[in-house]
Amino acid sequence: MTGLLDTNVALYLLGGQLAEPLPAGSYGVSVITEMELLAWPSLTTEEEKKVREFLGQVVICELTPSIRGRAVQLRKEQHLKLPDAVVCATAMEFGVELWTNDTSLAKVPGLNCRAVNVTRI
């Protein structure tokens, strides 16, 4: 897996707002991102279809005991929201970059983050 996409980057990708395409490779999302995308409040039937197609093309990273333990540690030590802690722990556990535009996550020790350029529509 090349990198883990945070929910904000997945939304930019789905919305056609990435200024440049992601580099070639295989990408994953945390089970948290999967749930956040599918539970988006104003999601239309057409958008849900697009989200499900996207989810079929990426690796869905399930919660393992190791990820859960690391997420708890990050929540306690870095005071992250639990969903953010799970996403960060997932990237750390897989040893991949977290693609996110959440600047607060870039401060998490041991986490390698990469931001994307976004075009405004």
What are these regions (language model features)?
Residues V59-T103:
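Active-site neighborhoods of divalent-metal-dependent phosphate/nucleic-acid chemistry enzymes
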Residues M1-G3, A24-S26, Q57-V59, M92-E97:
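Short active-site oxyanion
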Residues M1-V29, L38-R52, I121:
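Short, well-structured N-terminal submotif of metal-dependent ribonuclease cores
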Residues D6-T7, T33, N101:
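A secondary-structure boundary/capping signal
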